[in-house]
Amino acid sequence: MRMPLTPVGMVENQSAVVNQGDFLTQLSIISSTSPRLSAKYQSTYDKVTNWVLAGADVSQINRFGIGIQKMAGQDGYQNVLMTGYYSPVIHARRAPQGKYQHPIYAMPKYKRFSRAQIYAGALKGKGLELAYSDSMLDNFLLGVQGSGYIDFGENNLNYFAYAGQNGFPYTSVGRLLVEDGEIPKEKMSVQVIKDWAARNPSRLQGLLERNLSYVFFKNVPNGKVKGSAGIPLVPLASVASDRSLIPSGSVLLVEMPEIDDEGNWLGKHQLRLMVALDVGGAVKGQHFDLYQGIGDRAGHIAGLLKHYGRVWVLN
C-alpha cells in the first residue's frame, strides 16, 4: 500500500517559482489575522520565507532546513487532481426591478424548505431578501461557490458571505446532466452547464430543483474572501484541501497545470507556492481546489480546470 505522503530529499521540478510575492503576501495575511495558525507553522513559514527571499531556487531548498514530502497522487504516480474555484460577481439590485427578479436570501429562522419550495415562494415577504439578481443560474452558482460579490450598480462590490444551508443534501447538477445524457462526462464544466442553460431556459429551474440543497448568505459590505480557516485568500497562493491529509496552514509547492481558454492542458505546469486555507465538500484525498480569484475570468478558468500535477508538502 502506497503512503499518501512520502519524505523525499529533493523536488524533481527545477522550474522557477512564479508567485513568490503573492505567497509572501498570503503569509503576511496569516500572521496578521490568525496568530494561532501562524504560531503553529512559524518554523516552516520562517524557513520557506528565507528560501524565497534568497531567490526560491528549487535546487537549493535543502540548504534552508526545509523538509519535503511528496504526495502520492490519485494513481500512486504523483498525479494530484487540481480543480479550481473562485468568487463570482453577481449583478443585482436591492429591490425587484426589470430583469432583476431572482432573490438571494438571508438565513431564515426556519430553514427546512427544499429548493423547489423556496423557488415557489416559501420565503417570500419575510424580509429575508438581500438582493435580486438577473439570473437564477448565477444565484445557484453563487451557492455552489459559497460566497461572492454583489454589484448593485453603485460603483462598489458588496461581499456576500456564507450564512448557512437548508439542511438538504447537495446534488451535483453537472452529474445529473451527464446521467441524463445531456452532456458527455468528458465535456463537463461550469461553462458547458451555462451553455446548456442558455439553450434550455424552460428546463433550467426543473434541473436546479433536483438539487434540494439551498445556501443562504449574509451581506458583509467591506468583507474579504475568506477560507474555512477564517483567513483572507490570495488568488493562486491558497488552496482548499482535505484537512485529514493536509491540515490548514500547510505549505505546498504545487505544479499547477497550464490550460487554454477551452480547458485543454498545454503540456506544461507553473510551479507555485500555496497555503492550505480552505476546505470543500468534494475535496477529498489527493485533490486540491485552487482559489482563482474574483470575477468572470477567474470563474472561466475555475470552471475548466480539472487536470493533474505533482505536489510537495514543505515543513
Residue positions per predicted region:
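Solvent-exposed, well-ordered loop and adjacent helix/strand elements within mature globular domains
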Residues: 1-315
